[in-house]
């Protein structure tokens, strides 16, 4: 139920300035490069931990996905791994699809 899920999951929002601050501080203090979305997760984790607790957050993208933004925030050039660079230079492959689940399901079943 919605109530059961809401009891287990919390959410928060951050301003662009707070996100940038988290990225800068983490890079400066830990030499770990966050992407903007990861910075939100990391900051929420840090703010939500109780004394003595340890937590885990997950990054879903390499900071190079947001290259100009990340470089502007940390004031340094981000080195892109060779495999990622090759992938980013490849041809985009996508399929136009409606938002209807039935269309998605039919596509998957047609494979």
Give residue spans per PLM region.
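PLP-dependent amino-acid enzyme catalytic core
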Residues: 1-111
């Amino acid at each position: 139920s919605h109530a059961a899920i809401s009891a287990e999951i919390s959410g928060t929002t951050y301003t662009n300035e707070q996100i940038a601050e988290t990225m800068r501080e983490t890079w400066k203090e830990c030499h770990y490069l966050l992407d903007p979305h990861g910075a939100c997760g990391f900051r929420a984790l840090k703010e939500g931990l109780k004394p003595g607790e340890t937590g885990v957050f997950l990054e879903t993208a390499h900071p190079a996905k947001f290259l100009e933004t990340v470089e502007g925030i940390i004031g340094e050039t981000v080195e892109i791994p060779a495999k990622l660079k090759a992938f980013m230079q490849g041809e985009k492959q996508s399929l136009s699809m409606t938002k209807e689940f039935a269309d998605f399901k039919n596509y998957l079943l047609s494979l």
